[in-house]
Amino acid sequence: SYLTDKEITDRLVTEAYNRMQEDVQVAHILIKTNPNVATDTAAAYTKIQAAYKRLQAGEAWDLVVKQTSEDNPTKETGGDLGYVTALLPNGFYAFESAAYETPVGKYSMPIRTTLGYHIVKVTNKRPARGELDIAHILLRVKADGSDDKAVKTRIDAVYAQLVAGDRFEEVAKTVSEDKATAERGGAIGPIAINQYEKSFEDAVFALANDGDYTKPVRTRLGWHIIKRTRKRPTLTLEQAKRKI
């Protein structure tokens, strides 16, 4: 009936809204499945259950990850995926639920996603970082890093200009080597977690107030100074209902 559908929808929206208040740092063990091969799914299920039994028997998480996980980029680092936040993409609701419902330091039972079977371990939780509008000044460094020192000297001089009172937007227009954003005063727009390199993200979310800017930050592209122009207000439940 309509009412039960609406009740289910409301419950899911409220759940998503509550989850959006927190970011969760997770690690995982992944056994991949090929959805086109039925026997493959059964074999993968057997493997994930074997890994789960090893954990239950007290074996170290990192060792079991290293020896069993099929997620090559993370298996050498304890399966660490960094922080995630609701809403995860379609097909990952079970993963999201495991992340939010498992206590810090514990791991979930095996769960299924479109990738395969996972065991999810929660390593930390923090208040959600939310979204910021930001701008930046970028001075590029060559891929081989040969001019890193010279560029660092230049960005330090730019930082000194800002400290002396020069307007961020004007300086960005004049010196920034990110052509796409320089002409609009360095404005990038909104940033949420997992969109930029960790050094960049951590620096900008550490800024306490609108209008504050970072000291020079190094990424693969070069040296940045990043300004927080506005913290986007946290949605109310009613606003979230319209968005979700």
Regions found by a protein language model. Name each.
Residues 1-244:
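Peptidyl-prolyl cis-trans isomerase
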